[in-house]
């Protein structure tokens, strides 16, 4: 028996990169996985590599509260429960204030901050009612370390840290766990577009392993935060 046998996990941003790696590893460890993201074709490609009776594709825009509510509802209806929710949907666009790309700022705020909040508010009522569950938010080292070209992105990821820290206090003694995972540079399509190729990077699988570590601690242990950097 694998460590997450029959656990029900929802993973946003599951069509590629970190989200895909997380969804795949959780499935390998026995979880029933709901794949969420905007691109149905990418989600289906991921699903096709997994066992069809334990995976569900639900196209979802995390900036749309109604769609996120429906995602959580479908997960429960399909697999009969809700144990794990991974907020891995994220966006990194032009982040210099002096570039004045307000539309891109709005988009990052919507995906990175509102998406995290919408998913939490949809999942937590069920988790609180059953006195169990684990919410994991994928943040970023950029939330701690701002550069001249990462101002807006860093601000959104700092918000994810703050949201997670606040939830940790709100959920104390409820049986519901919450974790923030902050990767350094990860080799994905997003980072390839914005960063030099000679910079050291993590692999998406590295972040998936950090998620699994947080999920497999004893019941009385909550891993509040994990930082993952390349060496």
From Swiss-Prot:
Family listed: Belongs to the short-chain dehydrogenases/reductases (SDR) family.
Keywords: Oxidoreductase
Family annotation (InterPro entries): NAD(P)-bd_dom_sf (IPR036291), SDR_fam (IPR002347)
UniProt GO MF annotations: oxidoreductase activity
Protein name stated in the entry: Uncharacterized oxidoreductase SAOUHSC_02778
Organism: Staphylococcus aureus (strain NCTC 8325 / PS 47)
Pfam families: adh_short
EC number: 1.-.-.-
